[in-house]
Amino acid sequence: MSKPSLTLPRIVLHDLWQHKWILLLALLVLSNAVAVVYTSHVSRKLTTEWDQLLQERDRLDIEWRNLLLEEQSQTEHSRITRIASKDLNMSRPLPSEEIVVKVP
């Protein structure tokens, strides 16, 4: 027995070197698994953000419609004139009936 004894780390390294293609494939499979997990995470994050943006768009659309309705009702001058003349019996004064009041 003149053969030197090999230590366990040397044996493991020797086996790994002999089967380097299997080691390379194992590392590729592991990196692929990490990439799939990362891609899934990013996809879920973007989907959540997309849903929030859609909700914000819907909220802003409803607000815009309400503002348009409010603008239409506020700018309807004939409505104000009709209410003043019909319900309140008001009429536009003649220029001779106008009185200018000056505040000191």
Curated annotation (Swiss-Prot):
Q: Which UniProt keywords apply?
A: Cell cycle, Cell division, Cell inner membrane, Cell membrane, Membrane, Transmembrane, Transmembrane helix
Q: Where in the cell is it found?
A: Cell inner membrane
One Gene Ontology cellular component term attached to this UniProt record is:
plasma membrane
Report TM segments: 21-43
Predominant location: membrane
* InterPro entries, A to Z: Cell_div_FtsL
- At the top level, the lineage of the source is Bacteria
Q: Which residue intervals are topologically Cytoplasmic?
A: 1-20
Residues making up the signal peptide according to the UniProt record: none
The record describes the protein's role as:
Essential cell division protein. May link together the upstream cell division proteins, which are predominantly cytoplasmic, with the downstream cell division proteins, which are predominantly periplasmic.
Q: How does it assemble?
A: Part of a complex composed of FtsB, FtsL and FtsQ.
UniProt lists the family membership as follows: Belongs to the FtsL family.
Q: What is this protein called?
A: Cell division protein FtsL
Which species is this record about? Answer: Shewanella oneidensis (strain ATCC 700550 / JCM 31522 / CIP 106686 / LMG 19005 / NCIMB 14063 / MR-1)
Name the gene for this chain: ftsL
